[in-house]
Amino acid sequence: MEWSLTQNKLLAFHRLMRTDKPIGALLLLWPTLWALWVATPGVPPLWILAVFVAGVWLMRAAGCVVNDYADRKFDGHVKRTANRPLPSGAVTEKEARTLFVVLVLLAFLLVLTLNTMTILLSVAALALAWVYPFMKRYTHLPQVVLGAAFGWSIPMAFAAVSESVPLSCWLMFLANILWAVAYDTQYAMVDRDDDVKIGIKSTAILFGQYDKFIIGVLQIGVMVLMALIGWLNGLDWGYYWSILVAGGLFVYQQKLIANREREACFKAFMNNNYVGLVLFLGLAMSYWHF
């Protein structure tokens, strides 16, 4: 019986950290890899790559924990989130706080193996991860904070590899914010009706009937900024083809959200994994000359 309870608790932690749903980690991973490949340029040092890949998983898990902790009193009123570990009682508030601290400490121990500039930047990463979940109570633009949180690995990656944060770094950071606002608005469209009822704010609510148009503008902005990064770094045709393919995926997403149906909006959100992958493959093709 004791093992059964322990096993149930571990499964609850597993759900709380979303390790069964890797999409969030992947959306955090792709911009990190973009930055590492551009900063190097090419394949980054193996240890730095390993630190960032592990750090992505740990910080995404920590972000999920603090997000559910912040939303614990709201999630029970939303059909999609009512069975999450905190509102269902499978995990206590104290356990959630402890798990968050453990995950952050593990991530920080990894960062301590890197240079001083990266260590200093990691403090801002922690602040963004902690602040984001609470922003949806005070502003309709929490997705902007999410974009900054998901993109802060970009300046950290540049700092780790080159001890500098050049123009390309900040253009990529901005592109990631635009991309995150676009895909998280698609995600927020799924819960828009529930969010209005319980007082949660989001760009999906703010944009209203213009949501599809604004998402399209943001997606075009991502493509323009990523193309500018390619030009600044002298990347070859393979990279620009990847931007065109990403544009095709954005068009497909627009088709999916055309009628604002919940399942289709969620499918559009999930499709962004392929956008990140395609852009990374374009970078890899440009730097790896066979």
Swiss-Prot record:
Q: Which Pfam families match?
A: UbiA (PF01040)
Tell whether Zinc-finger is among the UniProt keywords. Answer: no
Q: Which domain of life is it from?
A: Bacteria
Quote one Gene Ontology molecular function term.
4-hydroxybenzoate polyprenyltransferase activity
User: CDD domains per the record?
Assistant: PT_UbiA_COQ2
Protein name, entry field: 4-hydroxybenzoate octaprenyltransferase
Pathway entry? Cofactor biosynthesis; ubiquinone biosynthesis
Q: What is its EC number?
A: 2.5.1.39
PROSITE patterns assigned to the protein according to its UniProt record, in alphabetical order: UBIA
Main location class:
membrane
Question: Which species is this record about?
Answer: Escherichia fergusonii (strain ATCC 35469 / DSM 13698 / CCUG 18766 / IAM 14443 / JCM 21226 / LMG 7866 / NBRC 102419 / NCTC 12128 / CDC 0568-73)
Cofactor(s) listed in the protein's UniProt record: Mg(2+)
Which InterPro entries is this protein grouped with? Answer: HB_polyprenyltransferase-like, Prenyltransferase, UbiA_prenyltransferase, UbiA_prenylTrfase_CS, UbiA_sf
Function, in words = Catalyzes the prenylation of para-hydroxybenzoate (PHB) with an all-trans polyprenyl group. Mediates the second step in the final reaction sequence of ubiquinone-8 (UQ-8) biosynthesis, which is the condensation of the polyisoprenoid side chain with PHB, generating the first membrane-bound Q intermediate 3-octaprenyl-4-hydroxybenzoate.
Known catalysed reaction(s)? all-trans-octaprenyl diphosphate + 4-hydroxybenzoate = 4-hydroxy-3-(all-trans-octaprenyl)benzoate + diphosphate
Q: Which HAMAP family match?
A: UbiA
Residues spanning the membrane = 33-53, 99-119, 141-161, 163-183, 213-233, 237-257, 268-288
List UniProt keywords, sorted A-Z: Cell inner membrane, Cell membrane, Magnesium, Membrane, Transferase, Transmembrane, Transmembrane helix, Ubiquinone biosynthesis
Task: State the top-level EC class.
Answer: transferase
Kindly indicate whether the keyword Transmembrane helix belongs to this entry. Answer: yes
Q: Where in the cell is it found?
A: Cell inner membrane
Q: Which GO terms describe its cellular component?
A: plasma membrane
* Topology with respect to the bilayer: Multi-pass membrane protein
Which family, according to UniProt?
Belongs to the UbiA prenyltransferase family.
Q: Name one GO biological process term.
A: ubiquinone biosynthetic process
